[in-house]
C-alpha cells in the first residue's frame, strides 16, 4: 500500500514553514558560495535572491544576474528545487527562472492587481505583491511551467499582468457556468504573452470547473498551428496532450468521444449552419 506525501500545503499557507536565510553557505565540488537570501518553504530552497547596493553605480541588477549564473555553474544542486530567482538593487527589482536571460527577468508592478499605478515597480510593490505567502504558493503551483520539445525545455514564470488577468478570468468562468455562459473578453497587447496566458488559464480551468473540455477556436490556420504548438510544448503542465480537429466531423467526434477533459484546437471555418449542435454536453469551454 502506498501513500501520497505532499511537501507543500497549497490550500492553507499557514500550515507551511517559511524561512528566509541571509548568507546561507553552500559547498559543492570545492566551491564555497553564499547567496544573499534564500527562501526555504518546508526546508526546500525555492527562491534565491541576489542583492546589490544601490549606492554603487558600477554594481547593479545586471551584476546580480551574472552572480546567479555563476551560482548555477558552481553549486548546481542548490537549484534542483529552485522555482524563482530574484535580482535587486532596490531601484530595479525583477524575477525570473534558472533558464531566463537577463531580458526575461520581469518586474512585478502591483500589490493587488490594481493597474492604476504600474509605470514603475517600486521595491515594496515588488516584494509585497509577489511574496505574500498565499500568492507565492499560488505562483509556485499554477504559474510556473516548462515549455519545450524535450531537448532543452525553458522554465517560464508568469508576469504580474498574466497572473492577475488569468485569476480574474477564472472567477468570471465560474460565474458564467451559473449564469449566461459568457466568460467575457481577455485582452492582451501584442507581444505580451497571450498564448502563455491561455496555457495558464487552461491549466487552472481543469480544477476550477471540474475537468471541462476546452475548445480553442481561431480565425486563421497559422494562428491555430501556433497556439497548438505552444500548448503541445506545455503538455506536462496541462497534464494532457492537445489535439487539432481536422474537419467538422472530426471535431464532433472529438467532443462526443469524451465526457470530460481534452484540449481541442479548431478554426471557425469548420463550423457551419445546421439544425443539430456539435455536442449536447454542458462542460465545454470555448
Kindly give the residue locations of the regions a language model identified.
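ATP-dependent helicase/translocase motor core
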Residues: 1-213, 222, 226-238, 259-263
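Short, hydrophobic beta-strand segments that form beta-sheet elements in well-ordered domains
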Residues: 85-86, 243-244, 286
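Signature of the SF2 helicase/ATPase Hel1-core->accessory helical subdomain module
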Residues: 61, 106, 272-286
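Conserved helicase motor
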Residues: 221, 242-252, 267-273
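Conserved motor-coupling elements within RecA-like helicase/translocase cores
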Residues: 246-264, 276-281
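Hydrophobic positions in the central parallel beta-sheet of the AAA+
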Residues: 216, 264-266, 286
Amino acid at each position: 500500500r502506498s501513500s501520497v506525501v505532499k511537501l507543500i500545503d497549497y490550500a492553507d499557507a499557514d500550515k507551511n514553514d517559511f524561512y528566509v536565510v541571509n548568507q546561507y553557505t553552500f559547498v559543492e565540488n570545492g566551491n564555497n558560495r553564499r547567496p544573499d537570501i534564500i527562501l526555504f518553504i518546508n526546508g526546500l530552497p525555492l527562491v534565491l535572491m541576489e542583492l546589490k547596493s544601490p549606492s554603487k553605480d558600477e554594481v547593479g541588477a545586471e551584476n546580480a544576474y551574472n552572480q546567479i549564473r555563476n551560482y548555477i555553474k558552481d553549486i548546481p544542486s542548490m537549484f534542483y528545487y529552485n522555482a524563482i530567482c530574484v535580482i535587486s538593487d532596490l531601484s530595479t527589482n525583477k524575477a525570473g527562472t534558472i533558464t531566463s536571460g537577463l531580458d526575461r527577468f520581469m518586474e512585478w508592478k502591483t500589490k493587488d492587481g490594481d493597474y492604476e499605478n504600474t509605470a514603475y515597480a517600486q521595491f515594496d510593490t515588488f516584494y509585497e505583491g509577489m511574496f505574500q505567502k498565499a500568492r507565492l504558493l499560488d505562483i509556485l503551483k499554477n504559474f510556473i511551467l516548462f515549455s519545450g520539445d524535450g531537448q532543452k525545455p525553458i522554465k517560464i514564470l508568469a508576469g504580474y499582468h498574466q497572473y492577475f488577468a488569468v485569476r480574474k478570468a477564472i472567477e468570471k468562468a465560474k460565474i458564467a457556468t451559473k449564469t449566461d455562459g459568457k466568460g467575457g473578453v481577455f485582452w492582451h497587447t501584442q507581444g505580451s504573452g497571450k498564448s502563455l496566458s491561455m496555457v495558464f488559464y487552461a491549466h487552472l480551468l481543469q480544477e476550477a470547473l471540474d475537468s471541462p473540455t476546452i475548445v480553442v477556436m481561431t480565425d486563421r490556420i497559422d494562428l491555430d498551428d501556433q497556439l497548438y504548438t505552444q500548448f503541445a510544448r506545455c503538455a506536462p503542465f496541462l497534464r494532457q496532450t492537445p489535439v487539432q480537429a481536422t474537419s467538422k466531423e472530426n471535431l464532433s467526434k472529438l467532443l462526443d468521444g469524451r465526457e470530460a477533459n481534452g484540449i481541442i484546437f479548431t478554426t471557425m471555418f469548420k463550423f457551419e449552419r445546421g439544425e443539430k449542435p456539435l455536442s449536447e454536453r454542458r462542460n465545454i469551454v470555448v
